[in-house]
């Protein structure tokens, strides 16, 4: 077998070091891929697969992309979850002795992509590190493009998944133990479209973590970073920082702080509730339009859009901080002219956070610096306008707000107003900034005059009227003579090229002139490149000032947006209390009222407290608006706790520590769970993790199983929630089980409400109004008629309904008295001063045995079998 070529030997050695990456290997004007990389990439990017002779018996599979267009191809691969290692030429191939020196300069992964063109400017691109140690999860999260860096610890799988859902990282790195901690990693990857990689154990050693963090942040002890109580968090943060060093291959100067946080610092919203409330995207379409963020986001900058998204996902629980935000919104709306002028000044500002990252990473081009300069121009007028908005939060923002005049003046004096995109093409540096640049430009300009004079002289000497001096990169400068005049060419012309219609020549004088002109051009281009790099470096030395200012701009943008939304939509400033009262007058759903075009949104009141009004049981037909009303209440509370004004006439909002929702129904087929099992899992999570300060939104609990089982579960859930010794949380509980309305009067904290309807013969009109009292009918047949079911089906349904009414259990429920207790009462319930209410007779053993005998196991799916087993288990429990 022939010997492998030196170039291919180097390729194979490099690929061995980056086995988990697609290797983009620079060869001239292309990045080439070989072997398996080439086969896979050619399919994904629809490139032509060719081959290259490299000393092997067969040609190596090969495909490639032009170097100037590589970013778009890399972004496509990274968005598909791949890692790309970029191996660059480190010297000019023309001057190389032997094989061209090449090195991997960066590894691009889903969580470390800094290309602004490919990222969603309104969303952070997070990478997360998770370490599992001794029943605890350390979590560190970073956005490389903005420098944001956080760490925390959690002690349960549920809390971990909630943090993953909140940050929604595009990439996770973890230790091997994480895969064995009980988390279904594959399911998490598929559901959230996250790339997950388990790294070698040495990444997660506490010694390396400490060393990496201390070195990067230039401190002597971990305590100096406020991390003394975050042992696992330190390991996760150190591993993540080490990984970023290895992939970015630079000093990460934009990561200036590590922020430890406790998940109890903000309102807790679990992943299910985030989806159900459609905070940042809709449940089905996964689109921003139709979400709460869509309504609130009138921001003018990318930084503001990202910060607003963070606010929506992290409502506050500290009253003073909420009121501080409210006062700024109120002040902005008290001076609408100033508010609108600030928004106008914000409009031209580019993404300062991501631009300074590109600058510190030495990847910013000349046009990036002009965008940066034009953004800085807006800072002084914005700061001036802020002086007209006096309040505590404005003062805090102004402390961080640096007008950066020195950097603006540097850019104004150094960089041309319309430079090329490439930093190596020249014409970047302004006249007057550097004497040598001015001198070389003068030589370049005179060179053009010299060329014009030489051309005129040669025409006169030779009599060739159409003689022209031209230039290309292959031949340099040359004299071009058409064929009709080639007989007049003098002997001292040296032919360089023959064309179809012309001949190209050089002369000793032209060659000498070329050396003078091109020498000046080459020196000028090289000098401009060095000066550009120096300007970029000067800016990067001010990264801390710039980041603080960018965050100040983001805050101003967010509050100006919230103020505008409040003004346009007639929102009110809610009172904030810590007594637990939620009192909303004429509340509206912030999203639905913007989506409907033909109807006026019907306003509704809500009142909940910690005593006699903890639980509202809401009955009424489908499509009447129960779910909208409950979500509306949750969103108003959430909006109040981000500091926003709310869609209501008046509102007094008691701070809640968590919002839980259980709405909707869908089978979790991927994990083999039925609608009912999904529902029960979510209810179990709520009952385990809610507190007396939480707000619960529960819709149709128990509908995924039989009527008796469903009613039993719903009844027991209400009992559990209503008992202040067990939970005592404020709850909106929508149900079709009208029997639950009997709990009003039996349980002190329960009150009945229903959605009003108006009957017109066999038809109904939904009034969308919440009224006191329980509904006595579900109007299901009327709703079916509205949906367009055939008349024959509707009539038959009426007949069956009349027969079933004779067996209605409502009267039985009404006659139930409070039981004195169960024979085998659970120990923890002995402390509860509330007796349990029995609904149904106990199940007999013979019934269960007969049902088991009748099951046709051969024709059951695994999912059917699981559901049947669950039903039988409940019946067995009912025996006691």
Regions found by a protein language model. Give the residues of each.
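Conserved catalytic alpha/beta cores of large enzymes that bind or transform nucleotide phosphates
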Residues: 164, 169-177, 183-184, 198, ...
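Amphipathic heptad-repeat alpha-helical coiled-coil/stalk segments that mediate oligomerization
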Residues: 204-212, 216-219, 267-268, 283, ...
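C-terminal tails and terminal domains of large nucleic-acid-associated
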Residues: 838, 842-880
């Amino acid at each position: 077998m022939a010997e492998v070529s030196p170039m291919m030997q180097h390729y194979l050695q490099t690929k061995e070091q980056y086995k988990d990456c697609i290797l983009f290997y620079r060869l001239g004007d292309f990045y080439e891929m070989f072997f398996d990389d080439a086969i896979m990439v050619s399919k994904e990017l629809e490139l032509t697969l060719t081959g290259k002779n490299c000393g092997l018996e067969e040609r190596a599979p090969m495909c490639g992309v032009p170097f100037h267009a590589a970013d778009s191809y890399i972004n496509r691969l990274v968005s598909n979850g791949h890692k790309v290692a970029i191996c660059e030429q480190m010297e000019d191939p023309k001057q190389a002795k032997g094989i061209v020196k090449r090195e991997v300069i960066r590894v691009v992964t889903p969580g470390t992509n800094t290309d602004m063109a490919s990222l969603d400017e309104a969303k952070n691109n997070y990478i997360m590190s998770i370490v599992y140690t001794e029943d605890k999860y350390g979590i560190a999260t970073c956005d490389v493009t903005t420098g944001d860096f956080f760490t925390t610890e959690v002690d349960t799988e549920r809390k971990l998944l909630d943090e993953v859902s909140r940050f929604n990282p595009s990439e996770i790195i973890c230790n091997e133990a994480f895969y064995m901690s009980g988390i279904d990693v594959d399911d998490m990857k598929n559901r959230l479209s996250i790339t997950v990689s388990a790294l070698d154990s040495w990444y997660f050693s506490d010694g390396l973590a400490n060393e990496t963090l201390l070195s990067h942040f230039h401190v002597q002890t971990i305590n100096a970073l406020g991390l003394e109580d975050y042992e696992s968090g330190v390991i996760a943060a150190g591993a993540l920082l080490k990984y970023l060093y290895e992939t970015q291959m630079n000093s990460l100067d934009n990561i200036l702080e590590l922020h430890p946080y406790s998940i109890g610092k903000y309102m807790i919203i679990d992943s299910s509730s985030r989806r159900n409330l459609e905070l940042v995207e809709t449940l089905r379409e996964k689109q921003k339009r139709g979400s709460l963020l869509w309504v609130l986001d009138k921001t003018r900058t990318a930084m503001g859009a990202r910060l607003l998204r963070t606010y929506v996902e992290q409502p506050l629980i500290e009253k003073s901080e909420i009121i501080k935000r409210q006062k700024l919104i109120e002040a902005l709306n008290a001076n609408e002219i100033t508010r609108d002028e600030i928004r106008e000044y914000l409009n031209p500002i580019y993404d300062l956070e991501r631009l300074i990252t590109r600058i510190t990473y030495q990847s910013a081009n000349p046009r990036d610096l002009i965008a940066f300069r034009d953004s800085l121009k807006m800072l002084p007028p914005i700061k001036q306008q802020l002086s007209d908005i006096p309040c505590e939060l404005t003062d805090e923002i102004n402390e961080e707000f640096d007008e950066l005049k020195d950097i603006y003046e540097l850019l104004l004096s150094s960089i041309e107003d319309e430079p090329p995109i490439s930093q190596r093409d020249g014409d970047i540096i302004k006249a007057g900034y550097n004497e040598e640049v001015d001198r070389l430009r003068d030589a370049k300009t005179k060179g053009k005059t010299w060329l014009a004079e030489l051309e005129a002289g040669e025409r006169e000497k030779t009599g060739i009227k159409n003689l022209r001096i031209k230039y290309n990169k292959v031949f340099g400068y040359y004299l071009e003579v058409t064929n009709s005049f080639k007989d007049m060419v003098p002997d001292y012309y040296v032919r360089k090229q023959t064309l179809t219609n012309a001949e190209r020549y050089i002369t000793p004088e032209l060659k000498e002139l070329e050396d003078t002109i091109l020498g000046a051009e080459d020196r000028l281009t090289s000098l401009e490149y060095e000066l550009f790099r120096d300007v970029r470096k000067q800016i990067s030395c001010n990264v801390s000032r710039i980041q603080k200012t960018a965050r100040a701009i983001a805050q101003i943008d967010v509050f100006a947006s919230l103020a505008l939304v409040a003004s346009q939509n007639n929102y009110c400033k809610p009172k904030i209390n810590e007594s637990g009262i939620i009192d909303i007058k004429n509340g509206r759903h912030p999203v639905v009222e913007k989506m409907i075009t033909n109807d006026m949104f019907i306003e509704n009141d809500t009142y909940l407290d910690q005593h006699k009004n903890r639980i509202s049981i809401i009955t009424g037909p489908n499509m009447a608006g129960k779910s909208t009303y409950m979500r509306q209440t949750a969103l108003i509370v959430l909006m109040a706790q981000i500091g926003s004004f709310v869609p209501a006439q008046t509102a007094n909002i008691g701070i809640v520590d968590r919002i839980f929702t259980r709405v909707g129904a869908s089978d979790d087929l991927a994990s083999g769970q039925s609608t009912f099992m999904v529902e029960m899992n979510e209810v179990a999570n709520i009952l385990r993790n809610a507190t007396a300060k939480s707000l619960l939104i529960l819709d149709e609990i128990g509908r995924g199983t039989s009527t008796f089982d469903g009613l039993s579960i719903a009844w027991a859930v209400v009992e559990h929630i209503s008992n202040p010794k067990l939970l005592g949380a404020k709850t909106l509980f929508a149900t079709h089980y009208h029997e639950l309305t009997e709990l009003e009067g039996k349980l002190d904290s329960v009150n009945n409400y229903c959605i009003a309807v108006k009957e017109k013969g066999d038809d109904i009109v939904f009034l969308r109004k919440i009224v006191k009292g329980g509904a006595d009918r579900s109007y299901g047949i009327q709703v079916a008629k509205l949906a367009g079911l055939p008349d024959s089906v509707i009539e038959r349904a009426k007949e069956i309904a009349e027969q079933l009414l004779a067996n209605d259990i409502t009267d039985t429920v009404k006659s139930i008295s409070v039981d004195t207790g169960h024979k085998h009462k659970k120990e923890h319930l002995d402390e509860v001063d509330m007796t349990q209410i029995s609904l149904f007779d106990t199940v007999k053993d013979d019934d269960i045995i007969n049902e088991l005998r009748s099951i046709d196991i051969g024709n059951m799916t695994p999912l059917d079998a699981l559901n049947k087993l669950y039903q039988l288990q409940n019946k067995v429990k009912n025996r006691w």
